């Protein structure tokens, strides 16, 4: 009996595609791991870039300002900002190859016929544009921060006032509730303090103005002589 071999490859492929036949280790090695490695490489590159950037700026800053302070009235603040921008531009180009990418794009798009001039002026134009954009961005951000400082202080003061008023109100409400609970639940009556009068046995007691007359009458009644029975 002759076996039909036309569908052998199809059957074998379907057999290999079954879930129990899939090799998870090969799937991870061939698909997941390369993508994960690419992400890790990009992350390490960004970390390395930031580390180099702040290291270079720290060296420059420490050499210009040993005490660690930058005065806003110093005449060197603008040169410092310009040098800071130049360091950022070169650090970005060193780690992410911005110049090479833009140079290729400029050469292929605009000036293929003048390659000599494009190789000279292309990178210079790219650096100048990046520098200007970065400088304008830093200046704009500094203006926003300066304008936001008074607003932030006003907001903080308003929040503090609101918290203080709320605390006073809460204390007043708690005092009122405790007073009402003592009166209603336990029947405690708070009497106002009045004058002190001597009692019949020589002791002093606290009396209010409303009970002064009745106490005097009671004392006189107790001191009256008792009648003698005949």
Swiss-Prot record:
One of its GO terms (cellular component) is fungal-type vacuole. The chain crosses the membrane at residues 78-98, 120-140, 148-168. Keywords: Membrane, Transmembrane, Transmembrane helix, Vacuole. Pfam families: DUF999 (PF06198). It is a multi-pass membrane protein. The keyword Protein biosynthesis does not apply. It is found in: Vacuole; Membrane. The keyword Acyltransferase does not apply. InterPro entries: DUF999 (IPR009340). Belongs to the UPF0494 family. This is UPF0494 membrane protein C1348.07. The lineage of its organism: Eukaryota, Fungi, Dikarya, Ascomycota, Taphrinomycotina.
């Amino acid at each position: 009996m002759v076996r039909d071999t036309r569908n052998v490859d199809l059957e074998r492929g379907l057999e290999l595609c079954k879930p129990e036949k899939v090799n998870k280790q090969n799937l991870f090695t061939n698909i997941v791991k390369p993508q994960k490695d690419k992400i890790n490489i990009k992350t390490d590159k960004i970390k390395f870039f930031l580390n180099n950037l702040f290291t270079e700026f720290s060296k420059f800053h420490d050499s210009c300002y040993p005490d660690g302070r930058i005065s806003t009235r110093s005449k060197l603040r603008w040169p410092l900002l310009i040098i800071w921008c130049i360091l950022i531009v070169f650090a970005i180009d060193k780690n992410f190859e911005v110049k090479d990418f833009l140079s290729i794009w400029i050469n292929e798009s605009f000036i293929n016929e003048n390659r000599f001039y494009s190789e000279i002026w292309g990178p210079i134009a790219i650096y100048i544009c990046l520098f200007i954009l970065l400088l304008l961005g830093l200046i704009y951000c500094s203006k926003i921060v300066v304008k936001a400082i008074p607003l932030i202080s006003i907001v903080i003061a308003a929040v503090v006032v609101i918290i203080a008023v709320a605390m006073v109100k809460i204390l007043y409400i708690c005092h009122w509730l405790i007073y009402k609970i003592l009166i209603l639940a336990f029947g405690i009556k708070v009497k106002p303090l009045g004058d002190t009068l001597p009692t019949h046995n020589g002791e002093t007691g606290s009396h209010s103005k409303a009970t002064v007359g009745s106490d005097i009458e009671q004392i006189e009644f107790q001191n009256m002589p008792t009648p003698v029975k005949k």
